[in-house]
Amino acid sequence: MTSASANLAHNLAATAQAQPHARAVILDDLVLTYDEVEHSARQLAGWMRAQGVGEGDRVALMLPNVPAFPVLYYAALRLGAVVVPMNPLFKRREIQFYLEDSGASLLAAMPGEDAAAAAGATGTRLLTVGPEGLSSYVHGDDAVDPVEEVVPRDGDDTAVILYTSGTTGRPKGAELTCDNLQSNQLATTETLLHLDSSDVVMGCLPLFHVFGMTCGMNTAFATGAALTMIPRFDPAKALEVIERDRVTVFEGVPTMYGAMLAAAGAAATPPDLSTLRTAISGGASLPLEVMKRFEETFGATILEGYGLSETSPVASFNHPDAERKAGSIGTPIRGVQMRLVGPDGAEVGASSEDDPQVGEICIRGENIMKGYWNRPDATAEAIDGDGWFHSGDLARRDEDGYYVIVDRKKDMIIRGGLNVYPREIEELLYEHPAVAEAAVVGVPHPELGEEVAAYVVLAPDAQADEAELVRHVKEQVAPYKYPRTVTVIDELPKGATGKILKRELRGDGA
């Protein structure tokens, strides 16, 4: 059914009408109200329309977390265009691939030679977002007639093309529909975060990533909560902003939680985070030791969940009104089904201590992408004939229906024919007081196929040698599981969202 309300731009319009003077976006001393963001989005939509952008056209946004991002995001959606978020750290080759693959007609980016060169090479119009933001397009010489009405969209129309990280080849664009994103933000808002207009959401997750886009920006703008931004995550800055803006909801990936703990420990004065009521973690498994220390230090409850770009992203969560099981990713959210399947495709049952059952997570529901942009074969491989999306993640399910991630299918180590799940070993390393971060990977071995190797970052002023860390794990697991090497490094390689890039540790580029 085609309607204006299916279009995500309706959320901003409705909130601006209901509470025009409420804070929408905060970036240090800059505060924009919902009326100001809505006015700017109408003006920018008019400018885009004057450049020939229309319904179904792709608009690429290559911006950090700055107020221009939500303005341009909702402006493009208002026209019925499709948003293509991009990492602002991309170089020319990466930018050019995204523009060519998506067929974007417009690229919005910060000033830079790479963006200009890629736009020129692909014939893509470039909108440069300078230090003054978008003022010239809203109030100045470039301003044109605004788009007053939200273009009606069908629920199955593509709203966003979100490219996967490309860990197994070139990135693929997941087509997320209006219904995908609306249902996911509604379920997140109403059943997980319980957001309302009194809340302040911390926007330090990149808005070009589905976690920050849906759980941060879309939920805030649909409920009238304020979104306070950090252009690039810095743990000390995050603590400062939580205290200054009285943040109530923090959303992060596991490495952010560890970094904030370290920053709090190094601060001359303990930060006042008393307003923080809920923190949510996703993107990777949160070490239990980090969860415990964060909650003890800051007094906020962490709810761990699970999702992917292809699932808009939230698929399951530890629901706040149900039992929380630390270390689990909870149960499926409203409108979503999950199950586990084995290598033969048969469904895997519940696990018990005597009978552990591991299978690949498969997901079906309102959150599943339409498909991969212009890649029907990849779509057919990922989504089976019954509508189940195959995630590539391994998990077990307990008798209460709670799922526990075991590992990425591709990250599982097969040592001499025996399966080793890196997360189990990482959890043990995190229990050592000297370890701040840990990652375990499989490395080639001429006889065993793969050997277990660990990389760790030590906590500030901590000391531990390889033998001590190997012994710490060896004493607690079967002989085939413990790492034969533990390498201490200054920093683990991470992606834009803070997720640890194990492929770089393996050195295989996979």
Tell me the role of every PLM-derived stretch:
Residues 331-335, 346-382, 420:
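Conserved ATP/PPi-binding loop(s) of AMP-dependent carboxylate-activating enzymes
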Residues 5, 21, 144-163, 170, ...:
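Conserved pre-ATP/AMP-binding loop-to-beta segment of ANL
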Residues 33-36, 159-183:
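Conserved AMP-binding A3 loop
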Residues 90, 107, 250, 365, ...:
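AMP-binding/adenylate-forming catalytic core of the ANL superfamily
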Residues 106, 114-155, 170-171, 263-266:
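ANL superfamily adenylate-forming
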Residues 244-252, 261-324, 337:
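Gly/Ser/Thr-rich phosphate-binding loop
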Residues 2-8, 13, 21-66, 70-74, ...:
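Conserved AMP-binding/adenylate-forming core of the ANL superfamily
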Residues 182-200, 208-249, 263-264:
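Conserved AMP-binding/adenylation subdomain of ANL enzymes
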